[in-house]
Swiss-Prot record:
It is found in: Secreted, Extracellular space. Belongs to the peptidase A1 family. GO terms for cellular component: extracellular region. The keyword Secreted applies. Keywords: Aspartyl protease, Hydrolase, Protease, Secreted. GO terms for molecular function: aspartic-type endopeptidase activity. GO terms for biological process: proteolysis. It comes from the Eukaryota. Its main location: secreted. It comes from Dama dama. This is Pregnancy-associated glycoprotein 56D. Expressed in placenta, specifically the maternal caruncula tissue (MCT) (at protein level).
Length: 11
């Protein structure tokens, strides 16, 4: 769940 929003933040 949170991995999805964190995915774009993991640039």
């Amino acid at each position: 769940s949170l991995r999805k929003m964190h995915a774009l933040g993991e640039t």
